[in-house]
Amino acid sequence: MNMMLILLMNIALAAILISLAFWLPHLNVYTEKANPYECGFDPMSSARLPFSMKFFLVAITFLLFDLEIALLLPLPWAMQFPNMNMLMTMAFILITILALGLAYEWTQKGLEWTE
């Protein structure tokens, strides 16, 4: 019951914050505020260049493997429980899914930096 109450409160808070951010107007939007800050100098080129997908893919790959470490880090403390078969099965499934994702990324040449 307490978990459901906390879950509903979190969903309500998230909905309120999203609706406030969506419906509140942007205050004081003018060109100086929208321009990038270049230490007082005139910009040499456009600062609104498109973001490279290579950087994005590296960041997402790093995030996935960082999540893997965060999920597997408590494993030694959890090994004190008597039912380790389920725990090891879940850890093996997680590592297998991530290894398959890495293999797919490698075969699609997503890890190669040269174009």
Swiss-Prot record:
Q: Which GO terms describe its biological process?
A: mitochondrial electron transport, NADH to ubiquinone
State a single Pfam family of this protein. Answer: Oxidored_q4
What EC number(s) has UniProt assigned to this enzyme?
Answer: 7.1.1.2
Q: Which reaction does it catalyse?
A: a ubiquinone + NADH + 5 H(+)(in) = a ubiquinol + NAD(+) + 4 H(+)(out)
Annotated keywords = Electron transport, Membrane, Mitochondrion, Mitochondrion inner membrane, NAD, Respiratory chain, Translocase, Transmembrane, Transmembrane helix, Transport, Ubiquinone
Any one GO MF annotation of this record:
NADH dehydrogenase (ubiquinone) activity
Q: Which GO terms describe its cellular component?
A: mitochondrial inner membrane; NADH dehydrogenase complex
- Spell out the subcellular localization from the entry: Mitochondrion inner membrane
Source domain of life is Eukaryota
- Membrane topology term: Multi-pass membrane protein
The membrane-spanning stretches of this chain are 4-24, 55-75, 86-106
The answer to keyword Transport applying to this record is yes
| Quaternary structure note | Core subunit of respiratory chain NADH dehydrogenase (Complex I) which is composed of 45 different subunits. Interacts with TMEM186. Interacts with TMEM242.
Q: What this chain does, per the record?
A: Core subunit of the mitochondrial membrane respiratory chain NADH dehydrogenase (Complex I) which catalyzes electron transfer from NADH through the respiratory chain, using ubiquinone as an electron acceptor. Essential for the catalytic activity of complex I.
The similarity comment for this entry is: Belongs to the complex I subunit 3 family.
Q: What is the name of the protein in this document?
A: NADH-ubiquinone oxidoreductase chain 3
The upper taxonomy is: Eukaryota, Metazoa, Chordata, Craniata, Vertebrata
